[in-house]
């Protein structure tokens, strides 16, 4: 290769690196307004009952691609469940969940240990009034012990939905009106159970942090001790919330690709508020974030069509 060719090749590589760095710098800022263009996913409208609507959304500025499922749990044809893998390694793809559980809509659920086989759930997993995994009661940060009651999503058999800061004791669940007042380098002194009330749900899972509370954006990532982790950063995302009408909102945002960068927690909260939620919670994200409708993957998890196997999921079934 001649000296001129080497210089041209080096200049081209340098230009590409500069473009990538500039693009990342431009896209890493947090947006306070996210104007989405939403439309009904047409090929789902004829097969699903009136209580289930599937939408796709686009914002060119960030940019992001997103999918939302709006579910009316009062529809007698609709059932909401939190489900757990029954495979030997305790993980399945959402398509497998969809087929095994006869679910029409499935999104990924809570955090799990990817480097352990069989895997274990990170935090509460409560299915059919039975504790599969207990709540995370404390975590270590910089050799300091932080007590925590992290955000949880709960379903009741009557179709009601709740999002709360939750802990567990044996097979009993308890929720707090406010999160524990943790701050980076400043943990709460103790875990005060006297401030907790029984939480009456049939299915529940820990994830977090909470994104919205009482109709307002309130991202409690520090209180739930997610500082010192990558969770607050820009990622592909899955979130769940509910409207004042009681409708469940499930949202998946693609990320880690040129056409869809992903969102941070504040941006995710904005999207959920714009979808009409009064309460909302962040679920497991990254390569786990996916939505399957009638066995078909709608999004591109972390830029691919390969589904990550997960331990828990939220399933919408039709009677």
Where are these regions (language model features)?
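Short, glycine-/Ser/Thr-/acidic-enriched flexible segments
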Residues: 25, 74-76, 112, 160, ...
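Zymogen propeptides
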Residues: 26-171
């Amino acid at each position: 290769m001649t000296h001129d060719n080497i210089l041209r090749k080096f200049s081209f590589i340098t230009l590409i690196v500069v473009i990538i760095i500039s693009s990342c710098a431009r896209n890493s800022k947090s947006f306070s307004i996210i104007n989405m263009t939403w439309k009904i996913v047409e090929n789902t409208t004829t097969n699903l009952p009136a209580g289930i609507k599937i939408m796709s959304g686009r914002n060119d500025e960030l940019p992001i691609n997103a999918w939302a499922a709006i579910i009316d749990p009062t529809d007698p044809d609709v059932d909401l469940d939190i489900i757990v893998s029954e495979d030997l390694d305790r993980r399945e793809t959402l398509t497998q969940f969809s087929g095994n559980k006869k679910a029409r809509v499935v999104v990924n659920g809570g955090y799990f240990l990817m480097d352990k086989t069989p895997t274990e759930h990170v935090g509460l997993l409560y299915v059919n009034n039975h504790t599969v995994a207990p709540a995370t009661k404390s975590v270590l940060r910089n050799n300091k012990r932080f007590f925590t009651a992290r955000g949880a999503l709960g379903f009741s058999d009557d179709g009601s939905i709740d999002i709360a800061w939750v802990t567990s004791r044996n097979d009993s669940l308890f929720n707090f009106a406010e999160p524990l007042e943790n701050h980076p380098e400043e943990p709460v002194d103790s875990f005060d159970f006297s401030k907790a009330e029984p939480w009456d749900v049939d299915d529940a899972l820990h994830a977090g942090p909470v994104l919205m509370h009482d109709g307002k954006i309130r991202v409690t990532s520090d209180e739930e001790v997610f500082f010192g982790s990558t969770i607050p950063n820009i990622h592909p995302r899955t979130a769940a919330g509910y409207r004042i009408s009681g409708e469940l909102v499930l949202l998946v945002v693609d990320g880690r690709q040129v056409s869809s960068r992903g969102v941070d927690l504040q941006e995710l909260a904005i999207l959920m508020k714009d979808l009409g939620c009064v309460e909302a919670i962040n679920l497991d994200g990254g390569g786990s974030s996916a939505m399957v409708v009638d066995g078909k993957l709608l999004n591109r998890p972390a830029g691919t069509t390969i589904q990550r196997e997960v331990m828990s999921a939220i399933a919408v079934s039709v009677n």
